[in-house]
Swiss-Prot record:
<dbReference type="InterPro" id="IPR004923">
    <property type="entry name" value="FTR1/Fip1/EfeU"/>
</dbReference>
<feature type="transmembrane region" description="Helical">
    <location>
        <begin position="204"/>
        <end position="224"/>
    </location>
</feature>
<dbReference type="GO" id="GO:0033573">
    <property type="term" value="C:high-affinity iron permease complex"/>
</dbReference>
<feature type="transmembrane region" description="Helical">
    <location>
        <begin position="107"/>
        <end position="127"/>
    </location>
</feature>
<keyword id="KW-0406">Ion transport</keyword>
<feature type="topological domain" description="Periplasmic">
    <location>
        <begin position="99"/>
        <end position="106"/>
    </location>
</feature>
<feature type="topological domain" description="Cytoplasmic">
    <location>
        <begin position="50"/>
        <end position="77"/>
    </location>
</feature>
<feature type="transmembrane region" description="Helical">
    <location>
        <begin position="139"/>
        <end position="159"/>
    </location>
</feature>
<keyword id="KW-1133">Transmembrane helix</keyword>
<keyword id="KW-0812">Transmembrane</keyword>
<feature type="transmembrane region" description="Helical">
    <location>
        <begin position="29"/>
        <end position="49"/>
    </location>
</feature>
<feature type="topological domain" description="Periplasmic">
    <location>
        <begin position="225"/>
        <end position="235"/>
    </location>
</feature>
<protein>
    <recommendedName>
        <fullName>Ferrous iron permease EfeU</fullName>
    </recommendedName>
</protein>
<keyword id="KW-0410">Iron transport</keyword>
<feature type="topological domain" description="Periplasmic">
    <location>
        <begin position="1"/>
        <end position="28"/>
    </location>
</feature>
<feature type="transmembrane region" description="Helical">
    <location>
        <begin position="78"/>
        <end position="98"/>
    </location>
</feature>
<keyword id="KW-0997">Cell inner membrane</keyword>
């Protein structure tokens, strides 16, 4: 097991054992707070990746070469930098998966997490062995779009959790009912619920929060980088 997976597993076990002692309303409140934290972290990660994706490969290679050429002290600094980067990503994974698991959609989110971890391990070995060459710019672009839709679902789930906790009781009318078209009891509906927070009969507030988050996020993501940021990267 990799260090990242161990860190995520230990953190997940601790959080799961802690939240299991909460009363129902407090647990719903905690779920909503976790979902909000996950949305903030994922959104920050998307725009950070957008900022660095153009030159990330060259910058990483130059930083590694420079650190290794300066001697053992800088080599250990590089090791610690990688360690803390992995720890940060592991914590992000814990909050994301916890927010997904709290939606109580059965075995599919844990199964998806295991498959995702296995895929990451395989891709890591292929990249290390030089079996594939990854276009990091395109990879960050499409995964960032995917993450924005995931975050929108988490935002809608947060407002639902706050309603169940008794903190938000406005606009709770059913916006539409898609159960006849895509039920959450079907395989595909369950996958959509686990990944994107899909609800077959969402409330008006859930739909509103989904659009209020996603539309500005997509617009900001589609805008070209600021001239100042571009100039600083090219300098």
């Amino acid at each position: 097991m990799t260090s990242r997976s161990r860190q995520a597993a230990y953190s997940g076990i601790f959080i799961n054992e802690t939240t299991g002692e909460f009363p129902q309303k407090e647990q719903e409140l905690f779920e909503g707070i976790v979902a909000v934290i996950a949305v903030v972290i994922l959104t920050w990660m998307v725009f950070w990746m957008r900022k660095v994706s153009r030159n990330v490969k060259v910058q990483l290679e130059q930083a590694v070469d420079s650190a290794l050429q300066r001697g053992n002290h800088h080599g250990w600094a590089l090791v610690m930098m990688v360690f803390f980067a992995v720890a940060r990503e592991g914590l992000e994974s814990v909050f994301f998966l916890l927010a997904a698991f709290q939606q109580d959609v059965g075995i599919w989110p844990p199964l998806g997490a295991m498959l995702g971890l296995a895929t990451a391990v395989v891709l890591g070995f292929l990249l290390y062995w030089g079996g594939i060459r990854l276009n990091l710019g395109a990879f960050f672009k499409w995964t960032s779009l995917f993450i924005l839709f995931v975050a929108a679902g988490l935002a809608a789930g947060a407002i639902r959790a706050f309603h169940e906790a008794g903190l938000w009781n406005h606009f709770q009318e059913i916006a539409f009912d898609m159960s006849a078209v895509l039920s959450t009891h079907s395989l595909f509906g369950t996958l959509m619920e686990g990944i994107f927070g899909y609800q077959e009969a969402p409330s008006v507030s859930e739909v509103a929060v989904w659009f209020i988050y996603l539309i500005p996020a997509l617009v900001a993501f589609a805008l070209p980088p600021r001239a100042g940021a571009t100039a600083s990267r090219s300098a």
